[in-house]
Amino acid sequence: MATGGYRSSGSTTDFLEEWKAKREKMRAKQNPVGPGSSGGDPAAKSPAGPLAQTTAAGTSELNHGPAGAAAPAAPGPGALNCAHGSSALPRGAPGSRRPEDECPIAAGAAGAPASRGDEEEPDSAPEKGRSSGPSARKGKGQIEKRKLREKRRSTGVVNIPAAECLDEYEDDEAGQKERKREDAITQQNTIQNEAASLPDPGTSYLPQDPSRTVPGRYKSTISAPEEEILNRYPRTDRSGFSRHNRDTSAPANFASSSTLEKRIEDLEKEVLRERQENLRLTRLMQDKEEMIGKLKEEIDLLNRDLDDMEDENEQLKQENKTLLKVVGQLTR
C-alpha cells in the first residue's frame, strides 16, 4: 500500500513502542502519584481511554503509516498510571506537547536502560533522531524519493542520454534541411545571375588570355589567382565559378566519353568477330568428329571382312590339303 514515500517497518514500530513505554515510566518517576489517586474513582480513570487513543494515533503518525492502518499495541498498566499523572499536570496534555520537545528528554532519560536492553537494534539511536519532528519526516521523505529515482534510473525507466541524443539528432536534421534550402536558393540565384550577366559565351568568369580585351569589371578576376578569387567572392559567386569550371570541363569529359564509346564499340565488334570465329571452329570440329566416327565405323566393317576372309582362307587351306591327299591316293 502506498504511504507517500515513507516506509513503515516492524523494527521502527517496536522501537517506538519501547521508547513510549520508557517515556511513560520516566514520567511516573518524575511525577509520583499518591495512593488515593489509584483508587476506584471513575472520574479519574475516564480520561485514560481518550489519552491512550491519542497516544496510539501519535504513534501511528510517527510510524508514517496511513490513516486507516492498525494502531499499535496498547501500553501496559504503567502507561495508564502515567496518563493519570500527566493529566493532573497542565503541561502534560498531549495537545500542548510536541514530539520535538519529548524526544531529547526521553532520549537522555532512556540512555541507561537502553544500554542494558538486548532487544533493541544497533541503529535505534539514529532511527530515534530521524523519526521525530516534521523536518526529520521531510528529510526522510526526500531520501526515499531520491532512492526511488535512483532505482528507476538503474532499471532504464529514465533515460536522459537517449533524450539528449534525440535532441542532437533533431538539431542535425534541422541543420541539414536548412543547409539544403540555402544551397537550393544559392543555386537558383546563381542561375539567375548567370542568365542576367552573361548574354554571350565570350563573357565569363573563367581566367582568359591576358591579350584579349575584357571589360574592366573582370580585369582583376582575370589576373588574380584562383585562390584569391575564391577568397574575394562570396559563396554564391564561388558556386558560379565551380559551375563554369564544370562547364569548361564538360567538353573534355564529352570528348573522353566519346573516345571511350568508340573504343567500347570497337571492342564489341571484335568480340562479335571472335564469337563468330569460335562458332565456325566449333562447327568444323563437330564435322571432323562426325567424319572420325564414320571412319571408325568403316574400319570396324573392314576388320570384320578381314576376319571373314581369314576364316575362308583357312577353310580353303583345309580343303586343299584334303584334295592333295585324295589325288596322292589315286596316283598310287
Swiss-Prot record:
Residues 176-198 form a coiled coil. Homooligomer. Interacts (via the C-terminal region) with WT1. Interacts with THAP1. Interacts with AATF. Interacts with BACE1. Interacts with SPSB1 (via B30.2/SPRY domain); this interaction is direct and occurs in association with the Elongin BC complex. Interacts with SPSB2 (via B30.2/SPRY domain); this interaction occurs in association with the Elongin BC complex. Interacts with SPSB4 (via B30.2/SPRY domain); this interaction occurs in association with the Elongin BC complex. Component of a ternary complex composed of SQSTM1 and PRKCZ. Interacts with actin. Residues 292-332 are annotated as: Leucine-zipper. Residues 1-14, 52-62, 185-195 have a biased composition (Polar residues). Preferentially phosphorylated at the Thr-155 by PKC in cancer cells. GO terms for molecular function: actin binding; enzyme binding; leucine zipper domain binding; protein kinase C binding; protein phosphatase 1 binding. The gene is Pawr. Induction: In ventral prostate following castration. The modification Phosphothreonine is found at residue 155. A motif (B30.2/SPRY domain-binding motif) lies at residues 61-65. This is PRKC apoptosis WT1 regulator protein. The modification Phosphoserine is found at residue 223. It comes from Rattus norvegicus (Rat). One of its GO terms (biological process) is positive regulation of action potential. Residues 137-195 are annotated as: Selective for apoptosis induction in cancer cells (SAC).
